[in-house]
Amino acid sequence: MARRQQPWATRTARDRTDAPARTQLLDAAESVFARRGYGLATIADITAEAELSRASFYVYFASKEEIFRVLAVRVRDAFLAAQEVPGVDLDDAAAVAEASTAAFISAYARHLPLLRLLEQQAQTDDDVRQLWEEIQERPVHRAARYIRRLSADGRLAPVADPLSVARAVGGMSIQFARLVAQRPTEYDAAVRDVTAMYLHLLGTGAAPCEPTGPRST
């Protein structure tokens, strides 16, 4: 008698990638890793957090190591998406700076516990190291290309090399995101202030932002 194939075994890679249960497991894994750390986290912890069976986990992931790497890819993509700024005129440097800064700070603050783990795991895992480097570098280089393009068109007069400006803005955004992770009420002020400094470095001549939100003391 032919062996009956389980329904899940016939799913395509696309089906598994798009499945709500997969997203549920990823969200649960991020929470568990943030709470317990990488070493102590188990697949049982993740499935319990997701309220799914252990068998469901193996439909989508082969191991704890794999789901951690998939999370790293998701975080990398979140930072790249932060620079997409849909609905914003890409020739409007001030609007792009504000929208991309807001999205970056939000994403970094939201994923901060996982980012700390990624940095640790990057010391011993080559795959995670590559993803960590992409998280650090790809948004910076994309921003630098944008600055170069507008500079070549005469729309910007950056105070330094575009790559240096992009690195400076990235560093400021990370520091403010860490503050926001501790004090979410500082989000609006963080976006306002980083945007103002970003525009100064771009040489846009934009007027300083007026204080409208809470400030740290």
Model region roles, listed by residue range:
Residues 77-80, 107-110, 127-153, 163-167, ...:
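Amphipathic alpha-helical packing segments from all-alpha helical-bundle domains
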Residues 61, 118-124:
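Short helix-capping/turn signature of helix-turn-helix
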Residues 28-32, 107, 142, 172:
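Short amphipathic alpha-helical elements of helix-turn-helix/winged-helix folds
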Residues 1-20, 159, 206-217:
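N-terminal intrinsically disordered/low-complexity leader segments
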Residues 70, 84-113, 162-169, 191:
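Hydrophobic alpha-helical connector segments
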Residues 116, 120, 129, 151-197, ...:
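Hydrophobic/aromatic-rich alpha-helical bundle segments in the mid-to-C-terminal region
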Residues 20, 24, 28, 32-66, ...:
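Helix-turn-helix
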Residues 35-39, 111, 153:
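Short coil/turn segments at alpha/beta junctions that flank glycine-rich nucleotide-binding fingerprints
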